[in-house]
Protein backbone atom coordinates (compact mmCIF):
# COMPACT_ATOMS: atom_id res chain seq x y z
CA UNK A 1 0.00 0.00 0.00
CA UNK A 2 1.41 3.42 -0.93
CA UNK A 3 2.26 5.69 2.00
CA UNK A 4 -0.27 8.40 2.59
CA UNK A 5 1.12 11.93 2.40
CA UNK A 6 1.21 13.55 5.86
CA UNK A 7 -1.94 15.58 6.00
CA UNK A 8 -1.85 18.80 8.00
CA UNK A 9 -5.53 19.48 7.50
CA UNK A 10 -6.48 17.21 10.39
CA UNK A 11 -6.40 18.90 13.80
CA UNK A 12 -3.53 17.79 16.03
CA UNK A 13 -4.10 16.50 19.59
CA UNK A 14 -1.63 15.33 22.27
CA UNK A 15 -2.67 12.31 24.32
CA UNK A 16 -1.02 9.67 26.47
CA UNK A 17 -1.64 6.42 28.31
CA UNK A 18 -1.62 6.63 32.11
CA UNK A 19 -2.42 4.16 34.89
CA UNK A 20 -0.99 1.60 37.32
CA UNK A 21 2.14 -0.44 36.56
CA UNK A 22 1.45 -3.66 34.58
CA UNK A 23 -2.16 -2.77 33.80
CA UNK A 24 -1.30 -2.72 30.08
CA UNK A 25 -0.49 0.87 29.06
CA UNK A 26 2.30 -0.04 26.65
CA UNK A 27 0.43 -3.05 25.26
CA UNK A 28 -2.54 -0.77 24.57
CA UNK A 29 -0.28 1.80 22.86
CA UNK A 30 1.10 -0.97 20.60
CA UNK A 31 -2.44 -2.28 19.98
CA UNK A 32 -3.70 1.17 18.92
CA UNK A 33 -0.92 1.53 16.32
CA UNK A 34 -1.41 -2.07 15.12
CA UNK A 35 -5.18 -1.82 14.71
CA UNK A 36 -4.97 1.62 13.04
CA UNK A 37 -2.11 0.43 10.78
CA UNK A 38 -4.43 -2.25 9.36
CA UNK A 39 -6.75 0.58 8.36
CA UNK A 40 -3.92 2.61 6.83
CA UNK A 41 -3.98 5.29 9.55
CA UNK A 42 -0.76 4.57 11.44
CA UNK A 43 2.67 3.02 11.24
CA UNK A 44 2.85 -0.21 13.18
CA UNK A 45 4.93 0.06 16.37
CA UNK A 46 5.89 -3.13 18.22
CA UNK A 47 5.57 -3.47 21.98
CA UNK A 48 9.38 -3.66 22.32
CA UNK A 49 10.03 -0.49 20.32
CA UNK A 50 7.64 1.40 22.61
CA UNK A 51 8.85 -0.27 25.80
CA UNK A 52 12.49 0.66 25.14
CA UNK A 53 11.72 4.31 25.67
CA UNK A 54 14.55 6.68 24.81
CA UNK A 55 15.82 9.19 27.36
CA UNK A 56 14.96 12.83 26.81
CA UNK A 57 16.05 15.92 28.63
CA UNK A 58 13.39 18.51 29.39
CA UNK A 59 14.23 21.47 31.66
CA UNK A 60 17.27 19.61 32.96
CA UNK A 61 15.30 16.49 33.89
CA UNK A 62 15.84 13.13 32.24
CA UNK A 63 12.56 11.47 31.30
CA UNK A 64 12.07 8.16 29.51
CA UNK A 65 9.19 8.53 27.07
CA UNK A 66 8.07 6.89 23.87
CA UNK A 67 6.37 9.06 21.27
CA UNK A 68 3.99 7.38 18.86
CA UNK A 69 1.91 9.06 16.21
CA UNK A 70 -1.25 7.88 14.53
CA UNK A 71 -4.41 9.19 12.89
CA UNK A 72 -8.08 8.51 13.08
CA UNK A 73 -10.50 9.55 10.35
CA UNK A 74 -10.85 12.95 12.06
CA UNK A 75 -7.61 13.77 13.88
CA UNK A 76 -3.85 13.41 14.03
CA UNK A 77 -2.54 12.26 17.42
CA UNK A 78 0.82 12.40 19.15
CA UNK A 79 0.74 9.82 21.93
CA UNK A 80 3.22 9.47 24.81
CA UNK A 81 3.81 6.35 26.82
CA UNK A 82 6.27 6.15 29.74
CA UNK A 83 7.81 2.96 31.12
CA UNK A 84 8.09 3.83 34.80
CA UNK A 85 5.86 5.57 37.33
CA UNK A 86 8.49 8.24 38.07
CA UNK A 87 8.71 8.98 34.33
CA UNK A 88 4.97 9.64 34.25
CA UNK A 89 5.16 12.05 37.14
CA UNK A 90 8.08 13.87 35.53
CA UNK A 91 6.51 13.91 32.08
CA UNK A 92 3.17 15.27 33.28
CA UNK A 93 4.75 17.93 35.48
CA UNK A 94 7.76 18.90 33.38
CA UNK A 95 7.38 17.25 29.97
CA UNK A 96 7.41 19.06 26.68
CA UNK A 97 3.78 18.83 25.63
CA UNK A 98 0.69 19.55 27.63
CA UNK A 99 -1.64 16.54 27.35
CA UNK A 100 -4.96 17.52 25.79
CA UNK A 101 -6.46 14.30 27.10
CA UNK A 102 -5.36 10.93 28.44
CA UNK A 103 -6.39 7.29 28.25
CA UNK A 104 -6.34 5.83 31.74
CA UNK A 105 -5.77 2.09 31.61
CA UNK A 106 -7.16 -0.05 34.44
CA UNK A 107 -6.99 -3.84 34.60
CA UNK A 108 -10.41 -5.44 35.10
CA UNK A 109 -8.61 -8.14 37.10
CA UNK A 110 -7.39 -5.63 39.72
CA UNK A 111 -9.58 -2.55 39.54
CA UNK A 112 -8.12 0.86 40.47
CA UNK A 113 -4.75 0.65 42.28
CA UNK A 114 -2.63 3.32 44.07
CA UNK A 115 -1.00 4.64 40.88
CA UNK A 116 -4.37 4.73 39.10
CA UNK A 117 -5.47 7.20 41.76
CA UNK A 118 -2.16 9.06 41.71
CA UNK A 119 -2.22 9.51 37.93
CA UNK A 120 -5.82 10.77 38.00
CA UNK A 121 -4.87 13.28 40.72
CA UNK A 122 -1.83 14.37 38.70
CA UNK A 123 -3.96 14.78 35.57
CA UNK A 124 -6.27 17.03 37.60
CA UNK A 125 -3.35 19.05 39.04
CA UNK A 126 -1.80 19.76 35.64
CA UNK A 127 -5.17 20.57 34.04
CA UNK A 128 -5.62 17.64 31.64
CA UNK A 129 -9.19 18.48 30.56
CA UNK A 130 -10.65 14.98 30.05
CA UNK A 131 -9.82 11.31 30.50
CA UNK A 132 -11.14 8.24 28.70
CA UNK A 133 -11.04 4.91 30.57
CA UNK A 134 -9.84 1.70 28.93
CA UNK A 135 -10.74 -1.28 31.10
CA UNK A 136 -8.12 -3.82 30.06
CA UNK A 137 -7.84 -7.63 30.44
CA UNK A 138 -11.62 -8.08 30.17
CA UNK A 139 -10.94 -11.42 28.43
CA UNK A 140 -9.65 -12.69 31.79
CA UNK A 141 -12.81 -11.86 33.75
CA UNK A 142 -15.90 -14.03 33.32
CA UNK A 143 -17.98 -12.30 35.94
CA UNK A 144 -20.06 -9.43 34.51
CA UNK A 145 -20.64 -8.15 38.05
CA UNK A 146 -16.90 -7.79 38.62
CA UNK A 147 -16.64 -5.63 35.46
CA UNK A 148 -19.51 -3.46 36.63
CA UNK A 149 -17.86 -3.03 40.02
CA UNK A 150 -14.57 -1.88 38.48
CA UNK A 151 -16.49 0.54 36.24
CA UNK A 152 -18.35 1.94 39.26
CA UNK A 153 -15.09 2.35 41.20
CA UNK A 154 -13.53 4.22 38.28
CA UNK A 155 -16.50 6.57 37.91
CA UNK A 156 -16.37 7.35 41.64
CA UNK A 157 -12.64 7.97 41.49
CA UNK A 158 -12.99 10.31 38.49
CA UNK A 159 -15.77 12.28 40.19
CA UNK A 160 -13.72 12.51 43.40
CA UNK A 161 -10.97 14.29 41.43
CA UNK A 162 -13.44 16.62 39.67
CA UNK A 163 -13.60 14.80 36.34
CA UNK A 164 -17.00 14.04 34.83
CA UNK A 165 -17.30 10.53 36.27
CA UNK A 166 -20.90 10.05 35.12
CA UNK A 167 -20.26 10.72 31.43
CA UNK A 168 -16.63 9.67 30.92
CA UNK A 169 -16.54 6.90 28.28
CA UNK A 170 -15.37 3.55 29.68
CA UNK A 171 -14.38 0.98 27.05
CA UNK A 172 -14.08 -2.69 28.03
CA UNK A 173 -11.41 -4.45 26.03
CA UNK A 174 -8.26 -6.53 25.84
CA UNK A 175 -5.12 -4.80 24.57
CA UNK A 176 -3.32 -8.13 24.13
CA UNK A 177 -6.29 -9.62 22.29
CA UNK A 178 -6.30 -6.63 19.91
CA UNK A 179 -2.52 -6.83 19.47
CA UNK A 180 -2.94 -10.51 18.53
CA UNK A 181 -5.52 -9.60 15.90
CA UNK A 182 -8.68 -10.96 17.56
CA UNK A 183 -11.54 -9.12 15.78
CA UNK A 184 -13.81 -8.59 18.83
CA UNK A 185 -10.94 -6.86 20.71
CA UNK A 186 -9.75 -4.94 17.65
CA UNK A 187 -13.26 -3.48 17.47
CA UNK A 188 -12.89 -2.32 21.08
CA UNK A 189 -9.70 -0.42 20.20
CA UNK A 190 -11.60 1.31 17.38
CA UNK A 191 -14.38 2.08 19.85
CA UNK A 192 -11.77 3.54 22.22
CA UNK A 193 -10.37 5.80 19.49
CA UNK A 194 -13.86 6.95 18.59
CA UNK A 195 -14.40 7.85 22.26
CA UNK A 196 -11.09 9.77 22.34
CA UNK A 197 -12.10 11.59 19.12
CA UNK A 198 -15.45 12.62 20.60
CA UNK A 199 -14.65 13.15 24.29
CA UNK A 200 -11.20 14.80 24.30
CA UNK A 201 -11.64 18.47 23.30
CA UNK A 202 -9.62 20.05 20.49
CA UNK A 203 -6.92 22.27 22.01
CA UNK A 204 -6.77 25.93 21.05
CA UNK A 205 -3.89 26.20 18.60
CA UNK A 206 -0.91 28.29 19.69
CA UNK A 207 -1.35 30.51 16.65
CA UNK A 208 -4.92 31.41 17.70
CA UNK A 209 -3.89 32.58 21.17
CA UNK A 210 -2.83 36.20 21.90
CA UNK A 211 0.68 37.18 20.76
CA UNK A 212 3.48 36.58 23.27
CA UNK A 213 7.26 36.52 22.86
CA UNK A 214 9.83 36.13 25.65
CA UNK A 215 12.85 38.37 24.97
CA UNK A 216 16.12 36.48 24.50
CA UNK A 217 18.40 39.24 23.26
CA UNK A 218 18.35 42.97 22.51
CA UNK A 219 20.48 45.11 20.20
CA UNK A 220 20.21 48.44 18.42
CA UNK A 221 20.50 49.18 14.72
CA UNK A 222 21.83 52.67 14.01
CA UNK A 223 19.17 54.86 12.49
CA UNK A 224 16.44 52.24 12.90
CA UNK A 225 16.08 51.66 16.62
CA UNK A 226 15.96 48.78 19.06
CA UNK A 227 15.47 45.14 18.07
CA UNK A 228 14.31 42.44 20.49
CA UNK A 229 14.82 38.83 19.42
CA UNK A 230 13.15 35.65 20.61
CA UNK A 231 10.93 32.74 19.70
CA UNK A 232 7.25 33.59 19.42
CA UNK A 233 5.44 31.41 21.97
CA UNK A 234 1.86 32.10 20.91
CA UNK A 235 -0.12 34.16 18.42
CA UNK A 236 0.82 36.34 15.47
CA UNK A 237 2.58 39.72 15.28
CA UNK A 238 2.48 42.14 12.34
CA UNK A 239 4.19 45.42 11.52
CA UNK A 240 2.10 48.24 13.00
CA UNK A 241 0.85 46.18 15.97
CA UNK A 242 0.79 47.88 19.34
CA UNK A 243 2.57 45.80 21.99
CA UNK A 244 3.30 45.94 25.71
CA UNK A 245 6.61 45.03 27.32
CA UNK A 246 6.37 43.58 30.82
CA UNK A 247 8.43 41.96 33.54
CA UNK A 248 11.52 43.10 35.48
CA UNK A 249 9.77 46.24 36.65
CA UNK A 250 8.86 47.44 33.14
CA UNK A 251 5.16 47.69 33.89
CA UNK A 252 3.05 49.39 31.26
CA UNK A 253 5.79 50.05 28.70
CA UNK A 254 4.12 50.25 25.30
CA UNK A 255 5.53 50.35 21.79
CA UNK A 256 4.64 49.77 18.15
CA UNK A 257 6.29 47.06 16.06
CA UNK A 258 7.86 48.81 13.06
CA UNK A 259 9.33 45.66 11.52
CA UNK A 260 9.35 41.87 11.86
CA UNK A 261 12.48 40.14 10.60
CA UNK A 262 13.60 36.54 10.38
CA UNK A 263 17.12 35.64 9.20
CA UNK A 264 17.51 39.26 8.00
CA UNK A 265 14.43 38.96 5.79
CA UNK A 266 11.38 41.14 6.31
CA UNK A 267 8.24 39.20 7.19
CA UNK A 268 4.61 40.26 6.79
CA UNK A 269 3.94 38.58 10.11
CA UNK A 270 5.65 36.40 12.68
CA UNK A 271 3.80 33.31 13.94
CA UNK A 272 4.01 31.00 16.95
CA UNK A 273 7.21 28.97 16.66
CA UNK A 274 9.15 31.54 14.57
CA UNK A 275 12.46 32.94 15.79
CA UNK A 276 12.21 36.64 14.97
CA UNK A 277 13.59 40.09 15.60
CA UNK A 278 11.05 42.83 16.36
CA UNK A 279 11.93 46.45 15.67
CA UNK A 280 10.33 48.54 18.43
CA UNK A 281 9.47 52.22 18.07
CA UNK A 282 10.55 54.66 20.80
CA UNK A 283 12.29 52.09 22.99
CA UNK A 284 15.92 52.54 24.04
CA UNK A 285 18.21 49.52 24.14
CA UNK A 286 18.65 49.88 27.90
CA UNK A 287 14.89 49.88 28.61
CA UNK A 288 14.38 46.30 27.52
CA UNK A 289 16.30 43.17 28.45
CA UNK A 290 16.36 39.38 28.36
CA UNK A 291 13.62 37.89 30.52
CA UNK A 292 10.98 40.48 29.67
CA UNK A 293 7.95 39.49 27.62
CA UNK A 294 6.43 41.30 24.63
CA UNK A 295 2.71 40.75 24.07
CA UNK A 296 -0.44 42.32 22.74
CA UNK A 297 -1.66 44.91 25.29
CA UNK A 298 -3.64 43.64 28.28
CA UNK A 299 -3.35 39.96 27.36
CA UNK A 300 -0.86 38.88 29.99
CA UNK A 301 -0.14 40.28 33.43
CA UNK A 302 2.87 40.13 35.71
CA UNK A 303 2.49 38.10 38.92
CA UNK A 304 4.59 37.57 42.02
CA UNK A 305 2.69 34.73 43.69
CA UNK A 306 1.38 31.50 42.24
CA UNK A 307 0.66 27.89 43.06
CA UNK A 308 2.54 25.18 41.21
CA UNK A 309 2.80 21.43 40.92
CA UNK A 310 6.49 20.48 41.07
CA UNK A 311 8.74 17.44 40.86
CA UNK A 312 11.97 17.56 42.86
CA UNK A 313 14.89 15.65 41.35
CA UNK A 314 16.48 12.70 43.13
CA UNK A 315 20.18 12.76 43.98
CA UNK A 316 20.81 10.22 41.16
CA UNK A 317 19.19 12.63 38.70
CA UNK A 318 21.60 15.40 39.62
CA UNK A 319 19.26 16.95 42.18
CA UNK A 320 19.66 17.81 45.84
CA UNK A 321 21.07 15.24 48.27
CA UNK A 322 18.99 16.55 51.15
CA UNK A 323 15.36 17.59 51.66
CA UNK A 324 14.32 21.26 51.73
CA UNK A 325 12.01 22.96 54.20
CA UNK A 326 9.46 25.74 54.23
CA UNK A 327 10.73 29.17 53.05
CA UNK A 328 13.38 27.58 50.80
CA UNK A 329 14.67 30.22 48.30
CA UNK A 330 15.94 28.81 44.99
CA UNK A 331 15.94 30.41 41.52
CA UNK A 332 13.00 29.90 39.20
CA UNK A 333 13.87 29.71 35.52
CA UNK A 334 10.73 31.02 33.82
CA UNK A 335 10.86 31.30 30.00
CA UNK A 336 14.15 33.20 29.51
CA UNK A 337 14.48 34.52 33.05
CA UNK A 338 16.15 33.44 36.30
CA UNK A 339 14.41 34.94 39.34
CA UNK A 340 14.67 34.17 43.06
CA UNK A 341 11.52 33.04 44.83
CA UNK A 342 10.44 31.72 48.19
CA UNK A 343 8.61 28.40 48.50
CA UNK A 344 5.77 27.86 50.97
CA UNK A 345 4.90 24.19 51.55
CA UNK A 346 1.32 22.94 52.01
CA UNK A 347 0.05 22.91 55.59
CA UNK A 348 1.23 19.83 57.42
CA UNK A 349 4.20 19.25 55.09
CA UNK A 350 7.41 19.65 57.08
CA UNK A 351 9.85 19.08 54.24
CA UNK A 352 10.18 17.87 50.66
CA UNK A 353 12.45 14.93 49.82
CA UNK A 354 14.35 14.52 46.55
CA UNK A 355 12.04 12.48 44.25
CA UNK A 356 8.85 14.00 45.71
CA UNK A 357 5.99 15.51 43.74
CA UNK A 358 4.30 18.35 45.67
CA UNK A 359 2.02 21.38 45.35
CA UNK A 360 3.78 24.57 46.46
CA UNK A 361 3.12 28.30 46.68
CA UNK A 362 5.86 30.52 45.25
CA UNK A 363 6.52 34.20 45.93
CA UNK A 364 9.00 35.75 43.48
CA UNK A 365 11.10 38.76 44.47
CA UNK A 366 9.55 40.78 41.63
CA UNK A 367 6.58 40.32 39.27
CA UNK A 368 7.09 38.22 36.16
CA UNK A 369 4.78 37.68 33.16
CA UNK A 370 3.27 34.26 33.72
CA UNK A 371 0.14 32.21 33.12
CA UNK A 372 -1.53 28.99 34.22
CA UNK A 373 0.06 25.96 32.54
CA UNK A 374 3.45 27.66 32.18
CA UNK A 375 6.33 25.29 32.89
CA UNK A 376 9.52 26.28 34.68
CA UNK A 377 12.68 24.84 36.20
CA UNK A 378 13.86 25.26 39.79
CA UNK A 379 17.60 25.89 40.00
CA UNK A 380 20.19 26.20 42.71
CA UNK A 381 23.76 27.25 41.99
CA UNK A 382 23.24 26.84 38.25
CA UNK A 383 21.93 23.25 38.36
CA UNK A 384 18.35 22.10 37.98
CA UNK A 385 16.89 20.68 41.19
CA UNK A 386 13.25 20.50 40.13
CA UNK A 387 10.64 21.37 37.54
CA UNK A 388 7.02 22.28 37.60
CA UNK A 389 4.11 24.10 36.14
CA UNK A 390 1.91 26.92 37.35
CA UNK A 391 -1.56 25.72 38.35
CA UNK A 392 -3.03 28.92 39.82
CA UNK A 393 -2.15 32.65 39.85
CA UNK A 394 -2.56 34.38 43.22
CA UNK A 395 -1.39 37.97 42.73
UniProtKB/Swiss-Prot annotation:
Keyword Metal-binding: yes
Superkingdom of origin: Bacteria
Top EC class of this enzyme: hydrolase
Any single Pfam family the record assigns to this protein: GTP_EFTU_D2
Enzyme nomenclature, EC number: 3.6.5.3
Function field: GTP hydrolase that promotes the GTP-dependent binding of aminoacyl-tRNA to the A-site of ribosomes during protein biosynthesis.
Quaternary assembly: Monomer.
NCBIfam families listed in its UniProt record: EF-Tu, PRK00049.1, PRK12735.1, PRK12736.1, small_GTP
Family: Belongs to the TRAFAC class translation factor GTPase superfamily. Classic translation factor GTPase family. EF-Tu/EF-1A subfamily.
Protein name in the entry: Elongation factor Tu
Native source species: Porphyromonas gingivalis (strain ATCC 33277 / DSM 20709 / CIP 103683 / JCM 12257 / NCTC 11834 / 2561)
